[in-house]
From Swiss-Prot:
PROSITE patterns: RIBOSOMAL_L2 (PS00467). Pfam families: Ribosomal_L2, Ribosomal_L2_C. This is Large ribosomal subunit protein uL2. It comes from Hyphomonas neptunium (strain ATCC 15444). One of the primary rRNA binding proteins. Required for association of the 30S and 50S subunits to form the 70S ribosome, for tRNA binding and peptide bond formation. It has been suggested to have peptidyltransferase activity; this is somewhat controversial. Makes several contacts with the 16S rRNA in the 70S ribosome. InterPro entries: NA-bd_OB-fold, Rib_uL2_dom2, Ribosomal_uL2, Ribosomal_uL2_bac/org-type, Ribosomal_uL2_C, Ribosomal_uL2_CS, Ribosomal_uL2_dom3, Ribosomal_uL2_RNA-bd_dom. Residues 251-260 have a biased composition (Basic residues). Transmembrane segments: none annotated.
């Protein structure tokens, strides 16, 4: 879909660039596939902020998207494409032959009336879901499971895709958009194609209020805080304290690695930030 620009009738519209969503469904979502969603405002059960810069925003209904795609060998027809406020990608409403409705992440080039299916012998076309062992090497994929039958966890946001680059002793080798090369069990499912809405990255909000509608609160620099709030806080005038940049919790930022190792690191063949 194309991008929309606007006449500068106000300062908030001068730089505004949005994705044209005129081809999407304009009505309400399917009621049986939606549920209420309460805003946490970045707080935990003690009421303390655990995630900064969250709060406010427009109320949303949660669309129950099927990330497992476990209805094997039952064709489904794409009824319509919809906007989903809870994610950057568009979603597709599909109807199985037995009448059941479901939402899935819409890949690029998926049109209304197309047929999608989950099958080990499915055609290699956008929207079809197959085990990694059944997908040809070199295929562009998204919606990738990390554990069999757990549901897709990787490559779900707008415009993203990964590439199957090899298979070896029960594992598939997948190259992610970040440049990381990692192994996943070849019994895990993945969907063919790249995720819809690739122009999302080119949107320009143009005003603070548009981010507030999305539930994003301002980011305050540590150097303008008090010493009790941040390691960079305090001092007379615009002083930074003379230390290297750190997070509010004292961890070094802007360069040094602070990530802890995980058991699954052994599945990463090449790190995303490895020098090529």
């Amino acid at each position: 879909m194309a991008l929309k620009t606007f006449n500068p009738t106000s300062p908030g519209r001068r730089q505004l660039v949005l994705v044209d969503r005129s081809a999407l469904h304009k009505g309400k979502p399917v009621k049986a596939l939606t549920q209420g969603l309460s805003s946490k405002g970045g707080r935990n059960n003690q009421g303390r902020i655990t995630v900064r810069h969250q709060g406010g925003g427009v109320k949303r209904l949660y669309r129950q998207v099927d990330f497992k795609r476990t209805r094997w060998d039952i064709p489904a027809t794409v009824e319509r494409l919809e906007y989903d406020p809870n994610r950057t990608a568009f979603i597709a409403l599909i109807k199985y032959q037995d009448g059941e409705l479901s939402y899935i992440i819409a890949p690029q080039r998926l049109e209304v009336g197309d047929t999608v299916i989950t099958s080990a012998t499915a055609d290699i076309k956008p929207g079809n879901t197959l085990p990694l062992k059944s997908i040809p090497v070199g295929t562009i994929i998204h919606n990738i499971e990390l554990k069999p039958q757990k549901g897709a966890q990787m490559v779900r946001s707008a415009g993203t895709y990964a590439q199957l680059v090899g298979r070896d002793s029960g594992y598939a080798q997948i190259k992610l958009a970040s440049g990381e090369l990692r192994m996943v069990l070849d019994s895990c499912l993945a969907t063919i194609g790249a995720v819809s809405n690739p122009d999302k990255m080119n949107e320009v909000s143009s005003k603070a209020g548009r981010n507030r509608h999305l539930g994003k609160r301002p980011t305050v620099r540590g150097v303008v805080m008090n010493p009790v709030d941040h390691p960079h806080g305090g001092g007379e005038g615009k002083s930074s304290g003379g230390r290297h940049p750190v997070s509010p919790w004292g961890k070094k930022t802007r360069g040094p690695k602070t990530r802890n190792n995980k058991v699954t690191d052994r599945l990463i063949i090449r790190r995303r930030n490895a020098k090529r």
